[in-house]
């Protein structure tokens, strides 16, 4: 595998300023293509209004070779909710730890303004019956502490199993944001479970999280020792392995498919071939995904969505290596027909467990297969400028893959490419 050029998060400010000062003032790369016309893929964080969820169509249509790659958030959210509900039904006789007739759960919310986080919160509440309508949609707001069931953003639900009725209650939920402003924060989730268990630990029967990073933090801090099932999302390697130790389950968002699509749409644009090549239509090497099984495509949204799979005690051994390339799209491209090209790609938070431990290793496996030389830029998870300051000379690159800190901030990147 060729040596990867990975740029550190703590790059010196003087270097960043130097890059800006020496950067192209709007010209293209040596290929003669203007920066604004180069292939661009948004991934993992879809350009959208963080308050309303409305897609940023301007960003998604930045040029003719712009796409988004992610996963089907609603389908995955529904799967997670169903997974939790199925577990409760199968274990109703033993899951009520204190025998009070109330099956209480706590929920770690990643980012109240992130579409995926919103969908997952809604999916769990809808499946468990604790959802409350707010302006025509399920309220995804944090409930705070709700031990007495008086919160307005959720409601108590009733579940009958084998003739016995149980109350299902969201005991507490909060956004896991740290003091520096970083969301989806695992350490904050670990602290939260400590606070919750100190106050009402005997009432917590299930732990649910918007992702595995936060879920594993709560599992390791408390749930594992107390044999409380914990459910996450992402199918990170440590979470999948933890299923053997009592972790309830997780959702694979088919990161192997997402990583492939992230680079494949760029490769196709750079080669001047149909965007579906090697995706829904086999390429010369035989790479091909199955639409409706592995992914779906929305032409209106210019978006590719990988489809999700529930990972539980029944099938977790099939998901133990989260960085393995997908067999269907594992064949090397011919370098004479797909010559090496240079790609600028950022990861919004270098400390994010899923992105750094699963997604980036997959990208690094696929960039070799697709003959792409990728510069990986690690962000701090807090500010766009920490990333954009290192896009000082876009003229050096043939294509771009962007993972924003906030979904609202696409213009922070396109304004640079438009110069």
What are these regions (language model features)?
Residues 1-10:
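Bacterial Sec-dependent N-terminal signal peptides
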Residues 18-21:
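C-terminal motif of bacterial Sec signal peptides marking the signal peptidase cleavage site
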Residues 23-419:
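A residue-level marker of the well-folded mature domains of exported/periplasmic proteins
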């Amino acid at each position: 595998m060729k040596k990867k050029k990975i740029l550190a998060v703590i790059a010196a400010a003087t270097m960043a300023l130097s890059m800006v000062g020496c950067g192209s003032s709007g010209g293209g790369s040596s290929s003669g293509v203007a920066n604004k016309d180069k292939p661009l893929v948004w991934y993992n964080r879809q350009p959208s209004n963080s308050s309303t969820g409305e897609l940023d169509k301007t960003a998604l249509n930045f040029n003719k070779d712009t796409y988004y790659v992610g996963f089907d958030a609603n389908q995955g959210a529904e799967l997670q909710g169903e997974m939790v509900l199925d577990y409760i039904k199968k274990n109703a006789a033993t899951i009520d730890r204190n025998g009070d007739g109330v099956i209480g759960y706590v929920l770690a919310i990643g980012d109240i303004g992130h579409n995926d986080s919103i969908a997952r919160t809604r999916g769990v509440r809808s499946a468990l019956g604790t959802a409350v309508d707010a302006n025509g949609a399920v309220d995804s707001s944090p409930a705070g502490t709700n031990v007495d069931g008086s919160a307005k953003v959720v409601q108590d639900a009733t579940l009958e199993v084998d003739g016995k009725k149980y109350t299902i209650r969201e005991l507490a939920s909060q956004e896991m944001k740290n003091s520096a402003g970083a969301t989806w924060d695992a350490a904050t989730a670990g602290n939260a479970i400590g606070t919750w268990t100190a106050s009402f630990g005997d009432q917590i029967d299930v732990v649910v999280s918007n992702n595995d990073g936060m879920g594993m933090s709560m599992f390791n801090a408390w749930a594992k020792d107390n044999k409380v099932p914990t459910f996450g999302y992402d199918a990170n390697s440590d979470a999948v392995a933890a299923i053997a130790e009592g972790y309830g389950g997780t959702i694979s968002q088919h990161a192997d498919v997402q990583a492939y699509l992230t680079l494949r749409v760029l490769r196709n644009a750079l080669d001047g071939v149909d965007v579906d090549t090697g995706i829904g239509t086999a390429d010369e090497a035989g790479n091909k995904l199955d639409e409706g099984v592995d992914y779906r495509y929305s032409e209106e949204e210019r978006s590719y969505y990988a489809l999700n799979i529930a990972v539980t005690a029944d099938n977790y051994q099939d998901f133990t290596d989260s960085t393995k390339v997908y067999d269907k799209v594992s064949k090397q491209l011919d370098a004479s027909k797909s010559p090496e090209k240079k790609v600028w790609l950022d990861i919004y938070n270098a400390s994010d467990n899923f992105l750094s431990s699963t997604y980036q290793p997959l990208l690094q496996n696929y960039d070799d297969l697709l003959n792409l030389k990728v510069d990986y830029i690690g962000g701090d998870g807090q500010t766009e400028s920490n990333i954009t300051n290192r896009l000082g000379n876009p003229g050096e690159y043939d294509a771009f893959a962007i993972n924003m800190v906030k979904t609202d901030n696409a213009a922070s990147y396109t304004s640079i490419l438009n110069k």
